[in-house]
Swiss-Prot record:
This is tRNA N6-adenosine threonylcarbamoyltransferase. GO terms for biological process: tRNA threonylcarbamoyladenosine modification. The gene is tsaD. The keyword Phosphoprotein does not apply. Keywords: Acyltransferase, Cytoplasm, Iron, Metal-binding, Transferase, tRNA processing.
């Protein structure tokens, strides 16, 4: 089956065509991603209205290009998958409405996909991974440890109780005057730094639960930067390196406890696996930390290619293909975008719920 995927949840506009064969193997036939980095860099972060307008301007052409690269037309597509949440509501509306229009015009089924499910299932596209497995989702908006039991079957074992890890990177970069996006800037600066100069806190280390916390670390970084007076390039490098060291040590404890729990709960799984997903998964220091941790616990470590860690439509198309193959019902044209949409939406919220519902 061939699935057209559409992704517009934040500041990347993307379209992709993915093939899923009868044996369940996946192949990306055509994939296009347009970053809005230039549009938002002057503001030091994503501006929702600018993002939505950019999606409107770019999406149609990107869909045409993805189809062209795949060598197919809309008649050859078996279904349409569009991100329906979580994310910025303006962008979600653009992508989902476009998906609905294509589905209506072609008579093909529509799958309104949870963006987080796209991340959760990417390892099955790239590595043919079998269920169950453990996923660490680390992005600008989410830090979660998730048990992936099957298509549509997810259980959050841990989540951030305050800032997501990607937020911590971005805010650290902003405090130090580094450019947007903050994650890559912090990683580059850290390469020349002394990771032992600052002893930053490791939030929740030793706690029996599997949740994460990064607001205290962010505060410690701010206090360290303010104590230095005029900050030199070496100071910035040392702060970034020490920050990454604290993150690595925190993840070793939090994720390590998750690996032990997986071993206990799924003793019959011969080759357990940890998958890392999300934009922060591109950080090489964190990848090395997780690889070492998996080696110690006898887990297979799977990190998708960098282009599939950040937002992309291939993972959305693949999630649609997985749902279609699993016999899950398609969505109607009344499917609504959701700014908040936890993967385990039927479960009790692990953290607070505001007026907009449970946090993802």
């Amino acid at each position: 089956m061939r699935i057209l995927g559409i992704e517009t949840s934040c500041d990347e506009t993307a379209a992709s065509v993915v093939l899923r064969d009868e044996e369940g193997r996946g192949r990306i036939l055509g994939d296009v991603v347009l970053s809005q980095l230039e549009e938002h860099s002057a503001y030091g972060g994503v501006v929702p209205e600018i993002a939505a307008r950019a999606h409107v301007e770019a999406l149609d052409a990107l869909i045409e290009e993805a189809l062209l690269r795949a060598g197919v037309t809309l008649r050859d597509i078996d279904a349409v998958a569009a991100t329906s949440g979580p994310g910025l509501i303006g962008g979600l509306i653009v992508g989902l409405m476009t998906g609905k229009a294509i589905a209506r015009a072609t008579g093909k089924p529509l799958y309104a996909v949870n963006h987080l499910e796209g991340h959760a299932l990417t390892a099955r596209l790239t590595d043919g991974l079998s269920f169950p497995y453990l996923m660490l989702l680390v992005s600008g908006g989410h830090t979660q440890l998730i048990l992936v039991k099957g298509v549509g079957e997810y259980e959050r074992w841990g989540t951030t109780i305050d800032d997501a890890l990607g937020e911590a990177f971005d805010k650290t970069a902003k405090l130090l005057g580094l450019p947007y996006p903050g994650g890559p800037a912090v990683e580059r600066a850290a390469q020349a730094g002394n990771a032992e100069r600052f002893d930053f806190p490791r939030p929740l280390v030793g706690d029996a639960r599997l949740d994460f916390s990064f607001s205290g670390l962010k505060t410690a970084v701010r206090q360290a930067a303010q104590s230095l007076g005029p900050v030199t390039d070496q100071d910035i490098a040392d702060v970034c390196a020490s920050f990454q060291r604290a993150i690595s040590r925190t993840l070793r404890d939090r994720v390590g406890r998750g690996l032990k729990r997986f071993r206990a709960d799924f003793a019959s799984v011969d080759q357990p696996a940890l998958v890392v997903a999300g934009g922060v998964a591109a950080n090489q220091t964190l990848r090395r930390t997780l690889q070492s941790l998996c080696d110690e616990h006898g887990f297979r470590f799977i990190a998708p290619p960098l282009q599939l860690c950040t937002d992309n439509a291939a993972m959305i198309a693949w999630a649609g293909a997985e749902r279609l193959a699993a016999g899950l019902p398609a969505d109607g044209l009344d499917a609504a975008p959701r700014s908040r949409w936890p993967l385990d939406s039927e479960a009790k919220a692990l953290i607070g719920s505001g007026r907009r519902g449970a946090k993802a």
